């Protein structure tokens, strides 16, 4: 994960000091890109331990179209708790937009089903996009989408994905997002009869919170280790049919976890 560490080092050395919504303050740059060849291994950070259970369950929760934290909490995942209301609701966040985007005439669009159909029947299309950024519903969201838009691309039998992340919390958020969309690429490739190619991460406002700088320096002092492999149950052929038990991580040998506070 040299690409990720290079971004962290660049922001520490060259980031502009900025204020932010949370009042914490950041070091920030605008515009950065990283590319991960998924043949090289699953891009899960090794310079600190990540909670893989949270990454998998959050992605399955998105794909369910769910916007209440009940499913996450039932599966030991608390990453959305700080933004939920007293009933566990988050408003029309990712799952709603992915699965039930509302049109002007009152109909809904299942962007994920549409994506899979397009990849299977018109792989060379340049319209394999899913957007979570719905200007008409942003005001009702507990947290507007940070990872706002993603696009798939087919070349031969290889499927690649590019994510645009408008707001990138480098220390806490970005490692989760890289792993989540790499996993989504493996899943989509499998159900479409393709091989996983590259995952491309593109960031807009890429920032380190000022209360994460010591943790970032500690992470940069650690030597990256070999990437693990994510094994996906080959029997699943429906993108909505995956369960947590269909994924197995092999060879993950990270450095210890580094604690850092979430800016809410």
From Swiss-Prot:
Highest taxon in the source lineage: Bacteria
Native source species: Aromatoleum aromaticum (strain DSM 19018 / LMG 30748 / EbN1)
Enzyme Commission designation: 2.1.1.45
Keywords: Cytoplasm, Methyltransferase, Nucleotide biosynthesis, Transferase
Name this polypeptide is given: Thymidylate synthase
Residues annotated for (6R)-5,10-methylene-5,6,7,8-tetrahydrofolate binding in this entry: 51, 169, 263
GO biological process, one term: dTTP biosynthetic process
MF-aspect GO terms: thymidylate synthase activity
Quaternary structure, from the entry: Homodimer.
Any Pfam family the entry gives: Thymidylat_synt
PROSITE patterns attached to this UniProt entry: THYMIDYLATE_SYNTHASE
Database matches in PANTHER family: THYMIDYLATE SYNTHASE, THYMIDYLATE SYNTHASE 1
Source organism phylogeny: Bacteria, Pseudomonadati, Pseudomonadota, Betaproteobacteria, Rhodocyclales
Record carries keyword Aminoacyl-tRNA synthetase: no
Binding site for dUMP: 21, 126-127, 166-169, 177, 207-209
NCBIfam families referenced in this protein's UniProt entry, alphabetically: PRK01827.1-3, PRK01827.1-5, thym_sym
Pathway: Pyrimidine metabolism; dTTP biosynthesis
Annotated active site: 146 (nucleophile)
Function: Catalyzes the reductive methylation of 2'-deoxyuridine-5'-monophosphate (dUMP) to 2'-deoxythymidine-5'-monophosphate (dTMP) while utilizing 5,10-methylenetetrahydrofolate (mTHF) as the methyl donor and reductant in the reaction, yielding dihydrofolate (DHF) as a by-product. This enzymatic reaction provides an intracellular de novo source of dTMP, an essential precursor for DNA biosynthesis.
SUPFAM superfamilies hit by this protein: Thymidylate synthase/dCMP hydroxymethylase
Catalytic activity: dUMP + (6R)-5,10-methylene-5,6,7,8-tetrahydrofolate = 7,8-dihydrofolate + dTMP
